Regions:
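Bacterial Sec-dependent N-terminal signal peptides
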Residues: 1-29
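Concave beta-strand-loop units of leucine-rich repeat
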Residues: 26-33, 49-62, 77-88, 96-113, ...
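Disulfide-braced loops of extracellular cysteine-rich modules
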Residues: 36-39, 67, 152
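ATP-binding pocket architecture of kinase catalytic cores
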Residues: 183
Length: 215
């Protein structure tokens, strides 16, 4: 594994073997609007391993329209997509349903107005999450337990091959059994914490043998 640093953004080159030859997937960490613009200005669409976009505290806000331009630059994500501190991000639609994220894991952290997660309702793409599925300090996220989003949001997930964590989601959850009605397997930690309007958690017998921590 070889780490390559530039003055614009951090790139991690990860080799992999496919069809008898060695290729490389880059991982990118983009800090702030200027680094995002520099990245999306590139003309080569590529498959990446990990993609992280951060809006540092106190920095210039990153407009949602600029975030969605990632779709012009990234064809597929095979590792983890991380969205952190994005003050203007409201939706996953137009992002994870355009970039091929069917083999990815996801981290959404400290995105105060993120609400629409309905792109995850595509069962063909997202019934299995190939890594972590973490939503942390995104209070406006609408789950499948909200009346207006029943059978939408990320309610179609059946398996998470990493950690599954929901932390500090404060939207209404009128039908808790609808959050993960089909969930059968979590390979990592399963944590529900600080979801103040989720008064109980259940999806029948499915969670009986899962490592669930409900706080």
């Amino acid at each position: 594994m070889k780490k390559i640093c530039s003055s614009i953004f951090r790139v991690l080159v990860i080799p992999y073997v496919m069809c008898g030859f060695v290729a490389a997937q880059n991982s990118y960490t983009l800090n702030g609007l200027s680094e995002l613009k520099e990245f999306t200005a590139g003309s080569v669409e590529e498959t990446v391993e990990n993609l992280t976009l951060i809006e540092p505290e106190g920095s210039e806000m990153i407009p949602e329209s600029e975030i969605l331009k990632l779709t012009d630059r990234v064809k597929k994500i095979t590792g983890t997509l991380t969205m952190e501190g994005l003050s203007q991000l409201t939706t996953t639609t137009g992002l994870i349903d355009v970039i091929d994220c069917s083999e990815a894991g996801f981290v959404f952290r400290d995105c105060p107005v993120l609400s629409d997660m309905d792109a995850f309702a595509d069962e063909d793409k997202f019934s299995v999450i190939h890594g972590d599925f973490i939503i942390e300090n995104c209070p406006q996220v609408m789950t499948g337990a909200a009346t207006a989003h029943l059978d939408k949001s990320f309610s179609k997930i059946r398996e998470v091959q990493g950690d599954l964590k929901l932390t500090n989601i404060t939207t209404a959850m009128n039908k808790p059994q609808k959050i993960f009605p089909y969930l059968e397997k979590v390979e990592g930690d399963f944590v529900v914490d600080g979801c103040s309007r989720l008064y109980y958690f259940t999806n029948g017998d499915n969670t009986e043998n899962m490592p669930l921590t409900y706080i």
